[in-house]
């Protein structure tokens, strides 16, 4: 029989219950027993939503208090030694690994965090050593599975596969071949399967998303040997791939001794024919035809026609599903009461997407007439979106068509610009700055909420925000920072803020998705041509600059990041949408410069995350991404200093594109990797200034001055003294004021020590070894 199933459901809860509960636990306001009870309630709610929608096989094990990769590391006992001695409690150990701090107050350096493939979700990077051991260490998956079965759900446990788990981890200390760990790891996977089998489970979903990457031959071979060795203890295995095409990994994937294969049709429709021709006759094919990464409702008529054709070949060996876990979309469109009615009709969130999968499955089982009403209603929605006049703006399209190469070049090269900027800004050696945002207190959030709800008027809101900006400027001046920021206190999110002010973009009220841990974001929805009617940031930056003689940065989010962190229209190339955003930002940059702002930061933390997973597609993306950044940034004089910021970026393979952005200063996240990221600059002479993140803002732990100095000295192995900036890893929005002021004070002290030690008149006197960071 054709089944409807799902690869994973959002964890955060319809009202973000997960976030509120886990943060209360971190603050010591609730017990661990209360934490676990909330986990049970959230999972039961998620399973009920899916079952009532008509999903046949319910994913179990997709819930996590922080991250599913972290959960897998803890489950198999891959707990770094620095955490083992700190906590006997496995839940607190997990939180300590993620945050560097456990609820009991114990601190140590957190595990590294990076992006999950090309999404805006972040995972905690497993750490492996040459003497790594594994053991079954956590029974969370078994408890959840048992709970689902006891509540009469047909449970399909979900786990990250062994090859993807190793690939996503990193060697700590001495480098070695991670595949050597399989011999110790596979018996633990076998234990997991044995226990799941003993519970009465029929199917298990094993996620191996790295099969859509360019894999080295030894990793391809490892798939064959690994899955031949794995003992599933009579469980049926659905091997799940997503985010791209199997391509050269298709043949080996079809050879694996598993019972079914899931493919991402939405991201890689061209692979379908090859999959159908190579799939062994006894295997299930799960077709991910509902887009798990975007919010547009499915064209059910078109999808059903495609699935009917597949069914004619596969019969009951066809399953229907979203393309990937629904972790990446909001939970329930029914919670949106303020969206324009026509716009809302075009959308589908997680609850609606599992219903779409169930509708299609029913159509395959019982015939089109069984879902005739749904098909008719859906057809009306599809036509409405295609013909709506609100999508196209002739003025925007004309402006985009008139863009020339000249608009994407600065007046002179960086060396000339730097001399002019140095004379104007009068900055010291090792200039200090922050990335942009400052702590968002409950008072600030309440102020913005009251303003949005109409409880306070424009005048009072502006007065209050100005008071907050003045306080932030005063704190920075007192701390001794060199280039200041206004704190972004008027912004709820670095992308949503601009989404609210740009035409062609809609904002939801409850469209939250998980970014990392308890951090949730509310991506804007780009539904039409994008344009700027009026200045978006000017009044706040002008006011902040009026309070100090030091430079205050204008703060903008770049075109690629706005694109990456939004749900984007799918009726034109993403590059075209990015160009429209870049033109709107260019107008804003020029307005800021005309007002006297001398430093303007255009954040592009998502620049690398948008990179296609397959290298063959890189060049096309990098060309248009670089052009869009330059289109936004190059309309200013030489004297205006352009900054950009990037997150979690491995630069080695795209360093030339980073340089091509031609930002005067780039700040990057690097502290968790202990400056390892700067190895990119060993062979490439990056010409502009760099500010490697000198302390980790994602952890509440405050670094010692000596630690900051040590990281700066490591950075000097790759960056000339006159080009090195001192700054945190990222914005400070999620930290509290006590942590922020103390950490920045230590950062400024470290910069002063460095200036003294590395002044041009004397030999460095700082008591640190000048050698590259260990890897």
Curated annotation (Swiss-Prot):
GO terms for molecular function: 5-methyltetrahydropteroyltriglutamate-homocysteine S-methyltransferase activity; zinc ion binding. InterPro entries: Cbl-indep_Met_Synth_N, Cobalamin-indep_Met_synthase, Met_Synth_C/arc, UROD/MetE-like_sf. Its cofactor is Zn(2+). L-methionine binds at residues 435-437, 488, 603. L-homocysteine binds at residues 435-437, 488, 603. The keyword Glycoprotein does not apply. Keywords: Amino-acid biosynthesis, Metal-binding, Methionine biosynthesis, Methyltransferase, Repeat, Transferase, Zinc. Zn(2+) binds at residues 645, 647, 669, 730. Pfam families: Meth_synt_1, Meth_synt_2. Binds 1 zinc ion per subunit. 5-methyltetrahydropteroyltri-L-glutamate binds at residues 16-19, 115, 519-520, 565, 609. It comes from the Bacteria. GO terms for biological process: methionine biosynthetic process; methylation. The active site is at 698 (proton donor). Its EC number is 2.1.1.14. It catalyses: 5-methyltetrahydropteroyltri-L-glutamate + L-homocysteine = tetrahydropteroyltri-L-glutamate + L-methionine. Pathway: Amino-acid biosynthesis; L-methionine biosynthesis via de novo pathway; L-methionine from L-homocysteine (MetE route): step 1/1. Catalyzes the transfer of a methyl group from 5-methyltetrahydrofolate to homocysteine resulting in methionine formation. Belongs to the vitamin-B12 independent methionine synthase family. This is 5-methyltetrahydropteroyltriglutamate--homocysteine methyltransferase. It comes from Coxiella burnetii (strain RSA 331 / Henzerling II).
């Amino acid at each position: 029989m054709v089944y409807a199933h799902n690869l994973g459901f959002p964890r955060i809860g319809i009202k973000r219950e997960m976030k509120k509960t886990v943060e209360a636990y971190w603050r010591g306001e609730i017990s661990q027993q209360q934490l676990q009870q909330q986990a049970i309630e959230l999972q039961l709610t998620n399973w009920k939503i899916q079952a009532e929608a008509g999903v046949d096989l319910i994913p179990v094990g997709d819930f996590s208090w922080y991250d599913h990769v972290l959960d897998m590391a803890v489950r198999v006992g891959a707990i770094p030694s620095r955490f083992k001695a700190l906590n006997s409690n496995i839940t607190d150990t997990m939180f300590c690994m993620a945050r560097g701090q456990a609820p009991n107050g114990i601190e140590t350096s957190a595990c590294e965090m990076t992006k999950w493939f090309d999404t805006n979700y972040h995972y905690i990077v497993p750490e492996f050593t040459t003497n790594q051991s594994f053991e079954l260490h956590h029974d969370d998956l078994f408890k959840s599975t048992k709970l689902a079965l006891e509540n009469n759900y047909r449970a399909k446990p979900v786990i990250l596969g062994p090859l993807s788990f190793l690939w996503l981890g990193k060697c700590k200390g001495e480098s070695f071949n991670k595949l050597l760990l399989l011999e110790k790891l596979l018996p633990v996977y076998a234990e997991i399967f044995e226990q799941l089998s003993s519970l009465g489970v029929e199917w298990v979903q094993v996620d191996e998303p790295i099969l859509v990457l360019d894999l080295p031959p030894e990793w391809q071979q490892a798939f064959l040997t690994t899955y031949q060795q794995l003992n599933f203890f009579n469980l049926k295995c659905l091997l799940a791939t997503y985010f791209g095409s199997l391509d050269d990994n298709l043949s080996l994937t079809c050879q694996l001794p598993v019972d079914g294969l899931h493919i991402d049709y939405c991201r890689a429709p061209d692979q379908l024919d090859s999959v159908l021709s190579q799939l062994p006759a006894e295997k299930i094919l799960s077709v991910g035809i509902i887009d798990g990464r975007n919010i547009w409702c499915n064209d059910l008529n078109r999808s059903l026609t495609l699935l009917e054709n597949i069914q004619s070949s596969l019969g009951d060996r066809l399953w229907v599903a979203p393309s990937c876990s629904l972790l990446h979309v909001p939970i329930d469109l029914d919670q949106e009461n303020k969206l324009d009615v026509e716009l809302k009709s075009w959308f589908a969130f997680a609850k609606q997407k599992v219903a779409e999968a169930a509708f299609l499955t029913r159509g395959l089982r019982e015939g089109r007439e069984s879902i005739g009403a749904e098909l008719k209603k859906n057809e009306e929605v599809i036509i409405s979106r295609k013909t709506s006049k609100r999508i196209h703006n002739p003025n925007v399209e004309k402006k985009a068509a008139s863009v020339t190469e000249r608009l994407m070049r600065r007046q002179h090269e960086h060396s000339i610009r730097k001399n002019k900027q140095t004379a104007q800004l009068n900055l010291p050696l090792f200039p200090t700055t922050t990335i942009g945002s400052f702590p968002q207190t409950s008072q600030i959030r309440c102020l913005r909420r009251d303003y949005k709800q109409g409880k306070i008027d424009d005048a009072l809101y502006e007065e209050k925000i100005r008071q907050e900006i003045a306080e932030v400027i005063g704190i920075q001046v007192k701390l001794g920072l060199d280039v200041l920021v206004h704190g972004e206190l008027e912004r709820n999110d670095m992308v949503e803020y601009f989404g609210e002010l740009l035409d062609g973009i809609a904002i939801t009220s409850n469209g939250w998705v998980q970014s990392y841990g308890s951090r949730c974001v509310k991506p804007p929805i780009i539904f039409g041509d994008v344009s700027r009617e009026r200045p978006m940031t000017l009044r706040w930056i002008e006011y902040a600059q009026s309070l100090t003689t030091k430079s205050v940065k204008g703060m903008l989010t770049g075109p690629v990041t706005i694109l990456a962190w939004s749900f984007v229209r799918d009726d034109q190339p993403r590059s075209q949408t990015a160009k429209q955003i870049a033109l709107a930002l260019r107008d804003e940059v020029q307005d800021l410069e005309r007002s006297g702002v001398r430093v303007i930061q255009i954040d592009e933390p998502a620049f690398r995350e948008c990179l296609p997973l397959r290298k063959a597609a890189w060049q096309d993306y990098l060309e248009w991404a670089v052009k869009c950044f330059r289109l936004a940034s190059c309309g200013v004089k030489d004297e205006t200093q352009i900054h950009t910021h990037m997150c979690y970026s491995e630069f080695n393979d795209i360093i030339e594109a980073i340089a091509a952005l031609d930002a005067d200063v780039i700040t990057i996240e690097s502290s968790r990797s202990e400056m390892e990221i700067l190895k990119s600059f060993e062979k490439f002479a990056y010409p502009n200034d760099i500010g490697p993140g000198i302390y980790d803002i994602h952890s509440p732990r405050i670094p010692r001055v000596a630690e900051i100095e040590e990281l700066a000295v490591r950075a000097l192995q790759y960056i000339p003294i006159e080009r090195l900036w001192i700054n945190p890893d990222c914005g400070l929005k999620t930290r509290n004021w006590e942590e922020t002021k103390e950490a920045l004070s230590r950062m400024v002290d470290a910069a002063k020590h460095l200036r003294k030690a590395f002044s041009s008149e004397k030999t460095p006197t700082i008591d640190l070894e000048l050698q590259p960071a260990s890897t």
